[in-house]
Structure formats: C-alpha cells, structure tokens
C-alpha cells in the first residue's frame, strides 16, 4: 500500500472513520505531491525496490516482473504451456481497461485483433493471471434500490499492482503530466488496491456500484458488522464538489427507498442501512477536511487502514 511505501503518512485511519462518528480528520496535512504518485504508480510496491537507491533502478523492477509474468510465470503456475505473445497482448488490453467495468469480450477483442486465439483460451489465461495475483475483479454491490435492469452488475477490473499495467503500456512517470485522464484510472486502481489490502486485514468487503441513472460509488467499503462507506476517488481537488454531490445523492436515494419500503406495514420491503461515512479520496488534496454536508475529504497522502 502507499502507507507501507511511504507515500502516505498514515495520519487518517479508514477504520476509525467508520467506527467513530466523532473521529476528527480536519486540518490533517499531506505532503505528498502528484509527481510522487506518478512515480509510485510506475514503481509499484515491490519489496525489492526498498533496497535500491536510484529511482531509475526502482522503475526497472516492475518491468522485470512484467516480462517474467508473460514469458515464464503464466505457464509455470500450473504447468500448462501458454503463448507469451498472447499473454503479453492480454496484459496490454487489461491495462487499457484498468479500473473499468469493460466487458471481457471487448478486452478479448483487443487481443484477437492481432492474435489468432479464442475466447476460451484467453479466459484460461485470465484465470492464470488471477492465480498469480496479477489481476483481480471487484464485485458489484447490488442492493435493490433500483430495478434489476438498471443496476450494472459488471465487475471492475484492477491490477493488484498497477506498475504491471504501466509496464505493459510502456509508460514512465513523466507521461502523466500531459495525461491526467489516464492517471485517473491508474489512481483509482491504486486506491482500490490499497482498500483491498485494508479490507482483508479487517475482515471487510470491497465492492463498487454503478447504475443506468448515473448513480455510482467507485468503492463500497463494507465492514463485517454491516457498517459501510461510500467512496469516490478523484485526482484533482476541482473534482471534489462533483464527487460530494454524487455521494449525497446516493445517500438520499437510500433514504427515500427506505421511506417507501416502510410505508406498507403488511408487506415491507428490505430496508438498507445508511452509509456510516461518505468519503472522497483525493490525489492532489493537501489537507483533510469535512464538508458542511458531512462528506470526509481525505488526501491519499494521509490514508491508512
């Protein structure tokens, strides 16, 4: 996680936000610059990096692992000989779709545009990459707040370490200076990876939500006792008001649904717990604060479990 590699000072605990409604984060500062996050994404969280001093050497670690994955590991994991070029192209296509809910058939179409391979074969390659802890899917949260046709149940695709994705794309840290849109996907992938680690540590679940009305949460962090946070992930502070508005709308949808569900006393519908916290995790924020509406703005440079 970014806390373990030093990009986060760890002064804000996600667990405490959920456990203590009086937990005060206001005024906590982050010293992490956007350029540091560019570098961290390309470097990755590989333990081998910790022993190196030169940044250029640190960036080579992820590239080495990337080559090893498609040249050797994808076959060695279960003893099945797999085509390195198919594996390389699949990693490239997955990287182009990181932190999205792109359909697998579309990801596979990228590969099949240049490689003579079937969907069944590519699916077995994905299984191998999952076993190797290279890629992982985040399940969708599917409460009955909307009709079944409105809720999108597609999984969100992420890399366990986004540095592998960036190695597949051939991207260096300075590239993001002129492409913050791409970094938005990379940053979301990075945050989701950290949240997954925190969820596993605290016996929690990490989900996401999207529906056809535009309602969404980049992450739904759900504790074992039912408490949960709705989380939006943004790079720039200029996107915070939009994220705040989206989270508040989500909370209001849950509230209105519950009000309606309770009106019919003889045949009540499910009532959903309201979120314990609404959180915007921001790459470029230098200070944590709580908005007037109660949304927590957390710089990634402060977050820990």
Language-model regions: role of each:
Residues 276-277, 281-305:
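Domain-level recognition of nuclease-like catalytic cores that cleave nucleotide substrates
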Residues 229-239, 250:
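Active-site ExK catalytic segment of metal-dependent nucleases
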Residues 16-26, 252-277:
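Short mixed-charge
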Residues 20-68:
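Amphipathic alpha-helical "lid/sensor" segments that cap RecA-like P-loop NTPase cores
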Residues 1-19:
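Conserved small helical "lid"/interfacial subdomain of P-loop NTPases
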Residues 50-227:
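Accessory nucleic acid-recognition modules appended to NTPase machines
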Residues 3-7, 167, 240-242, 287-292:
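Switch/connector loops and helix/strand junctions flanking conserved nucleotide-binding motifs
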Residues 227-229, 277:
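Structural motif
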């Amino acid at each position: 996680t970014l806390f373990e590699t030093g990009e986060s000072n760890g002064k804000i605990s996600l667990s405490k936000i959920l456990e203590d409604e009086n937990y005060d984060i206001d005024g906590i500062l982050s010293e992490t610059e956007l350029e540091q996050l560019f570098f961290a994404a390309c470097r990755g969280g590989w333990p081998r990096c910790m022993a190196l001093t030169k940044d250029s050497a640190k960036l080579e670690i992820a590239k080495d692992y990337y080559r090893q994955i498609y040249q050797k590991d994808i076959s060695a994991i279960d003893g099945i000989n797999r085509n390195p070029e198919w594996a390389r192209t699949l990693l490239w296509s997955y990287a182009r779709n990181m932190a999205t809910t792109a359909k697998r058939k579309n990801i596979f179409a990228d590969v099949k545009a240049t490689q003579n391979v079937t969907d069944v074969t590519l699916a077995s390659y994905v299984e191998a990459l999952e076993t190797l802890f290279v890629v992982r899917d985040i399940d969708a949260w599917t409460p009955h707040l909307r009709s079944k046709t409105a809720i999108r149940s597609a999984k969100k695709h992420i890399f366990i370490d986004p540095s592998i994705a960036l190695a597949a794309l051939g991207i260096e840290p300075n590239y993001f200076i002129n492409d913050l849109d791409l970094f938005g996907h990379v940053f979301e992938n990075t945050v989701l990876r950290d949240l997954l680690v925190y969820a596993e540590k605290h016996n929690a679940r990490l989900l996401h939500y999207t529906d056809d009305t535009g309602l969404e949460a980049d992450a739904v962090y759900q504790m074992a006792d039912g408490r949960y946070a709705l989380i939006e992930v943004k790079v720039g502070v200029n996107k915070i008001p939009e994220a705040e508005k989206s989270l508040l709308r989500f909370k209001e949808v849950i509230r209105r649904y519950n009000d309606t569900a309770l009106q019919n006393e003889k045949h009540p519908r499910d009532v959903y717990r309201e979120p314990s916290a609404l959180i915007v995790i921001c790459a470029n924020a230098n200070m944590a604060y709580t908005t007037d509406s109660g949304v927590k703005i957390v710089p990634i440079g402060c977050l820990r479990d």
